[in-house]
């Protein structure tokens, strides 16, 4: 259980190649007091990735063991690899008043919303399927058959957009980044958030009348 002054939880989801990871990294650079939750995964490390920064890379046996121990608030199998979000990682940050952003897929987002009803969810979509395919090809991480599989799955994933609170079209990266930042800032300024955070100031101002 988190306190009234706890941090906010944000979910950012998108089809593979939608740009959510780049947008989340930009958000962390632009906004203070917010951190990305590092997920556990059984997939191999990609070039440029770092252990404990991009993911915690573990084998399937370790992953299943953590599932059985209840270590994950959500977990899902995506493209034959497991991904999971640690309960402890989220709650520790929220309890210290730090905002947490989750870079996950729609399946994980669904599980997170059940556990954290106040979480703010954002779905990122590409300007077109052609643009999405081009991004997947430009990453040079997957073979043609894997890209085709990702494109087929993307069309199914896009159908889940109504389940989210906000929708951002990632056509212009800088514009999309500003829109994501605006969502975070606006949520921080909601009355129920500010009433707790600014309780002393409000009490002083009202008692001075």
Curated annotation (Swiss-Prot):
SUPFAM superfamilies: P-loop containing nucleoside triphosphate hydrolases (SSF52540)
EC top class named in words: transferase
EC number per UniProt: 2.7.4.8
Entry keyword annotation includes Transferase: yes
Keyword Zinc-finger: no
Domain of life from the UniProt record: Bacteria
Gene Ontology MF annotations: ATP binding; guanylate kinase activity
Location within or outside the cell: Cytoplasm
Keywords, sorted A to Z: ATP-binding, Cytoplasm, Kinase, Nucleotide-binding, Transferase
Amino acids binding ATP: 14-21
GO CC term, one of those recorded: cytosol
Domain Guanylate kinase-like residues, every copy: 7-185
One Pfam family cited in the UniProt record for this chain: Guanylate_kin
Catalytic activities: GMP + ATP = GDP + ADP
Protein purpose: Essential for recycling GMP and indirectly, cGMP.
Family statement drawn from the similarity comment of this UniProt entry: Belongs to the guanylate kinase family.
Name the UniProt record assigns to this protein: Guanylate kinase
Annotated organism of origin: Legionella pneumophila (strain Lens)
Lineage, broadest ranks: Bacteria, Pseudomonadati, Pseudomonadota, Gammaproteobacteria, Legionellales
